[in-house]
């Protein structure tokens, strides 16, 4: 995405890369080279569509998926495919850390519990199960930082993304010596820490040639997809909250201090804004639930429209509440609020009366119910929720927007910029280039609300009743999947 000095999108491009491989249940791997290859195709297209010259680019920003473990050898070669964010094979390593350090001490040290999704547990798994690969590991990076390393030669990471490694002292914004020593990780293998708008490198010869950018163009640290997406949606001060549905689903709130949920059911990370933090809940398989249905059962007759548009149009034929049909979106285990990698998805209440439309709508409602679990925890923690902004695929669909307003029982807003993480990364680059003095100033100047959706009073009651039933499903099925 190319942004001008007024915050307008001058041009953008996307390029697909190979989806993750899942050779066993709970595994998820990608090849880092695929990310770089896609970047090398997308960036020149975006520059061409923006009709700008390489010398017109003042600064480059970054965002990308969090938690993934990219391991390089001494010469910079990828040791093995990256274990990405939704890989949950590492539950034994999570338990090992918890037993060794103690659950309370873990949260005190990192503001988070040890979860299978976090980077450290993935490193521990490789060390235990692939010792020959582990012997080769010299450098450890996260996904977006691998791409930046390819174009700058600098090993760097921002505070927000580093928060999801389980190696950062989140409260003090530095690597945790306690965690490094407990896990046996050499700090010298980790990237240097930067605040998100800070310049951490410049485009090198490889990057200039591959991307069509000017040699020496400054590059900022950027942020993981959630913090960057929040910046792109203006979620930078307490009270404004986002609910974003991508492959995963996230409810995100900015805070002026580290806000801890005692049970570790919410993540507390550094924000992309210096001196600020955020608290968020995560649904593992939000948009992934709808993609799973599409891949397994199809999107209906191909009439030239986007398959997801066809699916949501079909879902609109079913009534709100789906006549009692419920979907729990636990296809990849679940984080918030269960912290259970063994949780499994379920359709509950299926009858001969139900149709494909009911099932699709139940998936849309079930994902919204899962996100509502985070709002319930926010309420318990006294985290202010004055405005809710929607992002991702859940903001593009008129039906899913309305379902979320009805499930949350709250007016929701949709901002103009649809690609929140890319837009946020560009804003961070603008701050790094000096276009704006701060992230707050930039968001106030360029983030604009395009529309609002109000809850339907007659439907809110139906959703409240179904949500109460939804909350009972996990407890009723947990023992079935525990083994």
Annotated model-derived regions:
Residues 15-17, 195, 271, 455:
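Active-site donor-binding loop signature of nucleotide-sugar glycosyltransferases
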Residues 48-85, 113-119, 148-169, 192-196, ...:
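Short beta-strand-loop/turn "lid" adjacent to the catalytic site in phosphate-handling enzymes
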Residues 15-16, 85, 284:
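A generic structural motif
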Residues 1-80, 108, 136, 208-209, ...:
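N-terminal glycine/serine-rich phosphate-binding loop of ATP-dependent small-molecule kinases
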Residues 32, 91, 98-115, 120-157, ...:
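Active-site core segments that coordinate phosphate-bearing ligands/cofactors
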């Amino acid at each position: 995405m190319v942004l001008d000095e007024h915050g307008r999108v001058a041009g953008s491009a996307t390029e697909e890369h190979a989806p993750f491989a899942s050779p066993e249940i709970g595994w998820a791997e990608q090849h880092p080279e695929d990310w770089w290859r896609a970047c090398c195709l997308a960036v020149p297209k975006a520059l061409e569509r923006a009709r700008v010259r390489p010398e017109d680019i003042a600064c480059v920003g970054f965002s990308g998926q969090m938690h993934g473990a990219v391991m390089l050898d001494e010469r910079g070669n990828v040791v093995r495919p990256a274990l990405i964010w939704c890989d949950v094979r590492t539950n034994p390593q999570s338990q090992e850390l918890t037993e060794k350090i103690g659950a309370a001490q873990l949260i005190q040290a990192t503001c988070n519990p040890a979860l299978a999704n976090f980077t450290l547990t993935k490193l521990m798994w490789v060390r235990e199960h692939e010792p020959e690969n582990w012997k080769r590991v010299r450098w450890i990076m996260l996904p977006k930082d691998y791409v930046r390393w390819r174009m700058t030669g600098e090993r760097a990471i921002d505070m927000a993304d580093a928060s999801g490694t389980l190696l950062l002292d989140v409260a003090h914004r530095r690597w945790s010596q306690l965690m490094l020593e407990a896990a046996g990780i050499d700090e010298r293998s980790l990237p240097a820490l930067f605040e998100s708008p800070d310049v951490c490198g410049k485009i090198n010869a490889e990057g200039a040639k591959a991307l069509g950018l000017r040699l020496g163009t400054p590059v900022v640290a950027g942020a993981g997809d959630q913090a960057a997406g929040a910046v792109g949606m203006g979620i930078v001060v307490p009270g404004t909250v986002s609910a974003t549905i991508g492959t995963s689903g996230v409810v995100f709130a900015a805070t002026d201090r580290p806000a801890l949920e005692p049970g570790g059911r919410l993540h507390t990370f550094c924000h992309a804004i210096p001196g600020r933090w955020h608290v968020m809940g995560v649904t593992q398989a939000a948009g992934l639930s709808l993609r799973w249905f599409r891949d397994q059962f199809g999107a209906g007759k191909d009439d030239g429209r986007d398959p997801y548009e066809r699916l949501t149009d079909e879902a609109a034929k079913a009534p709100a509440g789906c006549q009692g049909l419920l979907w729990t979106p636990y296809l990849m285990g679940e984080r918030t609020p269960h912290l259970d990698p063994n949780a499994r998805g379920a359709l509950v209440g299926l009858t001969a009366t139900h149709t494909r439309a009911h099932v699709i709508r139940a998936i849309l409602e079930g994902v919204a119910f899962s996100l509502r679990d985070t709002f319930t925890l926010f309420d318990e923690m006294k985290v202010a929720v004055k405005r809710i902004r929607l992002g991702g695929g859940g903001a593009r669909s008129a039906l899913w927007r309305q379902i979320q307003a009805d499930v949350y029982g709250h007016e929701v807003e949709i901002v103009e910029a649809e690609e929140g993480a890319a837009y946020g990364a560009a804003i961070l680059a603008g701050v790094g280039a000096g276009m704006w003095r701060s992230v707050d100033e930039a968001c106030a100047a360029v983030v604009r609300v395009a529309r609002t959706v109000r809850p339907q009073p007659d439907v809110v009651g139906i959703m409240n009743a179904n949500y109460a039933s939804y909350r009972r499903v996990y407890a009723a099925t947990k023992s079935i999947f525990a083994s």
